[in-house]
Amino acid sequence: IGLSYDTYTGKQISSQRAMRLTAVFSCVRVLAESVGMLPCNLYHLNGSLKQRATGERLHKLISTHPNGYMTPQEFWELVVTCLCLRGNFYAYKVKAFGEVAELLPVDPGCVVPKLNSSWEPV
């Protein structure tokens, strides 16, 4: 599943195959776990002061409850793992009553980003 890349030897390597290498697995794991354990908060500017936006729904999503089956640490570890191995991370925004209720991870291999002539997402 997913993309594979040709190496200078002519062999193809995918992210799954790369993760079988101890060095790759260890590097990705250290990065993912290090970022995953950090607190993630949403801030807003109040004049020149930054204040934590604890009343915002998005704050709860990114800091305490991204979805019904993942802790914030698991979610951010997956984000970093996808960024390391695929270069992108995508999440489906589940909306309820006009607000984002959950962020569901999507396999980057199943998404084709579309960009306009200015390289901005469409």
PLM ranges: what are they?
Residues I1-E120:
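Flexible, gly/proline-biased loop segments at the beginnings
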